[in-house]
């Protein structure tokens, strides 16, 4: 009886257990195949620009300076030029901008590239704009404003709008 049980166990193991092991084993001489693919991208030159308001405060006939900041963010190594428009005041130019006040009164002012108020800021690249090269980070550029002396205008609020243009 013992012999019969041993034969029965051996037969059962060969039919059930051991053939299953063959399902998980790799056949002798297994091969692999490989391939490759290209990965590409194009980075376009781009720039973003924003600016803070320039507030002169109260004007009493004396020189009034003020500052604004133009923030330029361009892709790395992208050359750019920042220009400032003449504004919306009647008869304004980039050398003499004009804020409009009560009854269409005009108050002249200037925008400059330097603290000494000697380098006018206009719109002609290579002449009166500010040039730079993008580095991927925001680059702040100071705008120096000034109202000249001895303008005798009506009291009230004066305003203008300047358009900042970044050419790249």
Regions found by a protein language model. Name each.
Residues 29-101, 129-168:
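N-terminal small/polar-rich segments of proteins
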Residues 2-4, 25-31:
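N-terminal short leaders/motifs
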Residues 16-28:
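C-terminal segment of classical bacterial N-terminal signal peptides
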Residues 105:
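Solvent-exposed beta-hairpin/edge-strand motifs
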Residues 2-17:
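Bacterial N-terminal signal peptides that target proteins for export
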Residues 114-138:
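Extracellular beta-sheet repeat scaffolds used for adhesion and glycan interaction
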